[in-house]
Regions:
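A short acidic, amphipathic alpha-helical/loop segment
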Residues: 188, 274, 302-303
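Conserved beta-strand-loop-beta-strand hairpin that lines the nucleotide-binding pocket
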Residues: 54, 59-74, 118-235
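Bergerat-fold GHKL ATPase/HATPase_c domain
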Residues: 1-112, 121-124, 236-277, 281, ...
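Short, non-transmembrane amphipathic alpha-helical segments
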Residues: 299-310
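Short acidic, S/G/P-rich loop/turn micro-motifs used as interaction or catalytic elements
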Residues: 230-231, 262-265, 292-295
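A short acidic (Asp/Glu
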Residues: 296-301, 327-329
């Protein structure tokens, strides 16, 4: 370990132990790393200047506290005693202290939902959790060494491939354990955060391009980002996907671009049927054509005429269409209306 790496290790340990040693952190770290008190105090001064620590008092009465900049990372074995609420409360809640109530609520919701998914579904042995905040954003990363979310969904739901598993996950109401889960956790978590990504063995589910991480080769990694000035609330997002005065999750948004494999065009009825899988679970379905430059006549006809006529109780709404896409959809809708 070179001097730079050793310095980072010391600072990391200070931040990890500061809450347990607010008054004796200098002596504790000096003993732990066999360094002088002056060396520790230099690290403390730097951390305070950077916003990672704050202090009160002077001399022997000086106390240190976490600053506005905070982070915590740890790894835990997935034992029967490990629970999402306990690890939040005992290990990570301090990272979010002092933030707006809506921000804390969103972070706790996403944190506990994704950790619970690992506990109940990953079949892994270890979980690693990282939480970070600076002046502008909060980042939460949760990774496991299990089978991999898309591989497991493909296997248990008998889907064509892992890409189809990703696509079904994006719709919502997908669970491999219907007796104990609603399939809504990932759907809503991905929408309450400003950025959300799942990376599992090279297959990525993302609502943004704000992350730049090395692909996860084993298990599953979930990345969540929330801006500190967000006014979003969990309730407002839930209301967006439930009808007026209803408590049922009855609306979904389907990112049509996920149905494309590589450079292929969306032209066939088989592709459309893959898109339509399980949408009978919803009353309102928005087809988001963002990033789709063109579609074929058969693809449009299968969704907006054939399926629409056989499912009149489901509202199918295309959005974010380029002109070529809009023309093809309008043609299919006109054919339906004229019959």
């Amino acid at each position: 370990m070179n001097n730079k790496e050793r310095g980072e290790s010391i600072r990391h340990q200070i931040l990890k132990d500061i809450r347990q040693h607010p008054t004796d952190i200098s002596r504790y770290i000096a003993d732990s790393f066999s360094i002088t008190l002056q060396a520790v105090n230099n690290h403390l001064k730097r951390l305070e200047e950077e916003g990672w620590l704050q202090s009160s008092g002077r001399g022997k009465g000086k106390r240190y506290f976490p600053g506005d900049m905070r982070e915590y990372r740890s790894q835990f074995p997935l034992t029967v005693d490990f629970t999402e609420d306990a690890v939040w409360r005992e290990q990570y809640s301090f990272v979010f202290e002092g933030l707006q109530e809506n921000i804390v609520d969103i972070c706790q919701y996403g944190f506990t939902e994704m950790v619970n998914n690992v506990i109940d579904h990953s079949d892994g042995t270890l979980i690693e959790i990282y939480a970070f905040r600076d002046k502008e954003r909060i980042v939460i990363i949760i990774a496991d060494d299990g089978e991999g979310i898309f591989k497991k969904i493909k296997r248990l739901c008998d889907l064509q491939d892992e890409r189809q598993a990703l696509f079904e996950l994006s719709k919502g109401k997908l669970t491999t354990d219907p007796d104990n889960h609603t399939g809504e956790g990932i759907f809503f978590t991905s929408r309450v955060f400003d950025a959300f990504e799942i990376d599992s063995k090279g297959v990525k589910f993302s609502h943004s391009d704000q992350f730049d991480f090395i692909g996860n080769e084993s298990g599953t990694a979930v990345y969540m980002l929330l801006k500190r000035d967000s006014n979003r609330t969990i309730q407002s997002v839930f209301d967006d996907y439930a009808g007026p005065d209803e408590f049922q999750f009855n609306k979904t948004v389907i990112p049509v671009r996920l149905a494309q494999y590589g450079n292929e065009k969306l032209v066939s009825r088989s592709q459309a049927k893959r898109l339509l899988l399980r949408i009978e679970l919803f009353q309102n379905v928005l087809f988001d054509f963002d990033g789709v430059s063109a579609i074929g006549q058969a693809f449009a006809d299968e969704i907006f005429r054939v399926y629409a006529q056989s499912h009149p109780d489901i509202d199918l709404v295309p959005v974010k269409m380029e002109e070529n896409v809009k023309k093809m959809i309008n043609r299919a809708i006109s054919s339906r209306v004229s019959k």
